[in-house]
Amino acid sequence: MAGKPETRYDSKKITDSIKGLKDFYTGMLALALFEAIRGVADAPHERFFPQFWLLLFAFCTTLLPFYHGNVRYFDDNYLDKTPSSARLFMLDFLLLSVVGALLVWMGAIFGEKFKPDYFIKLYACLLVMDIVV
């Protein structure tokens, strides 16, 4: 058996990594929701207008599908114990981190200096990124 040794992946390490990544992503989305709530609480109420509430609703209803979809993606693609799936883990981790950071950024926009056009551009960027990735 002189040849290239077969690469083996430790399924416990992969499972632990996925669990840690899901916890990290959960924290990022919780921070995004917290930032949106904090912005609403800190902003003067006379600045609120129907478009603000509509965009806040769109943001909050976007968090759950993004969370559920990404967590399920990692379960389906990395916990099925196929060796080839572990090769792209770092790329998926990077992209998930970018999506999480974008959601936190969007949550932080709500508040006194809320700009609907800016929020809509970030929201469109998030949706395009979700479609492409």
Question: PLM features: what roles do these ranges have?
Answer:
Residues M1-G69:
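N-terminal topogenic module of multi-pass integral membrane proteins
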Residues L91-V133:
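Membrane-proximal helix-loop-helix units in multi-pass membrane proteins
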Residues Y67-S84:
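Membrane-helix interface/capping segments
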Residues I18-L21, W53-F57, R87, L91, ...:
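Physicochemical signature of membrane-embedded alpha-helices that form the seven-helix bundle of GPCRs
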Residues L79-L95:
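Juxtamembrane helix-capping/reentrant segments at transmembrane boundaries
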Residues I14-I18, P83-S84, K113-D117:
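Juxtamembrane/transmembrane-helix boundary motifs in multi-pass membrane proteins
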Residues A41-H45, F74-N77, F110-G111:
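Membrane-interfacial segments
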